[in-house]
């Protein structure tokens, strides 16, 4: 049996991994002297900037090791037995999962923090060979296949999307055959997809998994994923936002066990965020260059809530607005204009509150003692009513002098 793991590139780590993950588009300082159109076009390069961080390094390691375990399984004798079971499922006969799916995991994090970018960069490094081809036996294996969960959580839609992704890489016609088959039910499609995964897929990444939340077909899709995990034996990564956590954790134990993995939140105001700001600030296309200081860096953090995607959009749009209105500089004014006009839709999702000071000096808060008040028990409502009647006064007004009275219109 051929060792498919030998086709993988060596696993990177440390400084070598950081350099491989980082993407810094070329930047010429004299671009600031170019015409407006040229600078506006070049400004889009800021979206290509990607810096390695703890999240991207961890995602790379998780994907690499997941692919490694998946390829190791393809060399075992259990693969042949599982393939026979999958053929039974295609023929609508009773079948069982043999390989198991302990290698599945999740990558959960807020939108815009760089999950998809980290996954894409990691897949590029892992898939140095787009298709692994062996002769004896002849086999074509795609190291990593990435698909998206259908917006309506359609089970059939996801299964066909997996087949379509394989066809686009190998030039096969699995999807067309499945769509035109007379027995193209969900059960037969699961068997077909599981067999395709065994033969041709190393690592399957399913993005936007949060689409299963709130959909009628969500539970069915979750059970379908669990069956594919058990029947294919490959590593499957489920990628989504935190909204999917209650669905996965509160569901069946088998699904929750196969959904363990990585969880990320927006960046803290630390050295990693400061390095990102410093790097992005180098890509200036306005005529008057400015330097980044601590005050500006804190302002940027407050108005992006530590979300790298929002930070990039803010710096891009601030320069674009400044170039178009003739200011030609990055200032608080241009940044505020971009934040208020271009990022208005994100305001409900951005907390523009300053982080609490880390100083050890604390202000002493003096709380004055409240004046003692009389309790209701010290007054007799009966006596108040009698006195009001004798003086021919409004009873409610008299009661309000001693207790809180709320009048309700009937």
Indicate where each model-derived feature is located.
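The catalytic "switch" region of P-loop NTPases
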Residues: 193-196, 200-203, 213-214, 223-291, ...
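Walker A/P-loop nucleotide-binding motif
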Residues: 95-120
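Post-Walker A helix-loop "phosphate-sensing" segment adjacent to the P-loop in P-loop NTPases
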Residues: 125-137, 168-169
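The feature captures the helix immediately C-terminal to the Walker
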Residues: 120-124, 312
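Conserved catalytic segments around the Walker B and adjacent sensor/switch elements
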Residues: 131-150
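Mid-core helix/loop region of P-loop NTP-binding domains shared across ATPases and GTPases
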Residues: 76-79, 83-90, 96-100, 154-161, ...
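The conserved phosphate-sensing helix
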Residues: 304-318
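Trafficking entry modules
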Residues: 1-72, 247, 331-410
């Amino acid at each position: 049996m051929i060792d498919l793991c030998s086709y993988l590139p060596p696993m990177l780590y440390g400084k070598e991994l950081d350099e491989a993950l980082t993407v810094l588009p070329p930047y010429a300082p004299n671009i600031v002297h170019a015409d407006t159109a040229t600078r506006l076009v070049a400004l889009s390069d800021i979206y290509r900037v990607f810096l390695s961080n703890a999240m991207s390094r961890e995602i790379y390691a998780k994907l690499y090791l997941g692919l490694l375990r998946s390829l190791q399984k393809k060399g075992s004798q259990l693969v042949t037995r599982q393939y026979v079971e999958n053929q039974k499922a295609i023929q609508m006969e009773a079948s069982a999962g043999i390989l198991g799916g302990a290698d599945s995991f999740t990558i959960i994090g807020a939108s815009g923090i760089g999950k998809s970018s980290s996954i894409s960069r990691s897949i590029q490094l892992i898939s140095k060979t787009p298709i692994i081809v062996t002769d004896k036996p002849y086999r074509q294996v795609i190291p990593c296949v990435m698909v998206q969960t259908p917006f309506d959580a359609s089970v059939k839609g996801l299964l066909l999307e997996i087949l379509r992704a394989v066809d686009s890489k190998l030039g096969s016609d699995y999807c067309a055959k499945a769509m035109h088959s007379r027995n193209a039910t969900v059960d037969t499609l699961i068997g077909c997809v599981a067999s395709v995964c065994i033969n041709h897929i190393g690592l399957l990444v399913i993005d936007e998994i949060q689409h299963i939340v709130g959909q009628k077909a969500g539970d069915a899709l979750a059970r379908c994923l669990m069956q594919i995990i058990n029947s294919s034996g490959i590593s499957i990564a489920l990628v989504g936002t935190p909204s999917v956590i209650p669905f996965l954790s509160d569901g069946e134990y088998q699904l929750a066990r196969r959904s363990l993995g990585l969880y990320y939140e927006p960046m803290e105001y630390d050295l990693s965020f400061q390095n990102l700001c410093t790097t992005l600030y180098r890509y200036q296309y306005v005529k008057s260059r400015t330097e980044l200081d601590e005050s500006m860096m804190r302002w940027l953090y407050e108005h992006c809530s530590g979300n790298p995607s929002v930070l990039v959009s803010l710096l891009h749009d601030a320069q674009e607005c400044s170039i178009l209105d003739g200011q030609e500089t990055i200032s608080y004014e241009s940044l505020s204009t971009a934040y208020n006009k271009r990022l208005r839709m994100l305001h409900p999702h951005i907390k523009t509150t300053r982080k609490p000071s880390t100083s050890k000096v604390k202000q002493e808060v003096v709380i004055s003692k409240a004046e003692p008040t009389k309790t209701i028990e010290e007054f007799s409502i009966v006596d108040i009513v009698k006195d009001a009647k004798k003086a021919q006064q409004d009873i409610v007004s008299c009661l309000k002098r001693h207790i809180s009275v709320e009048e309700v219109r009937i």
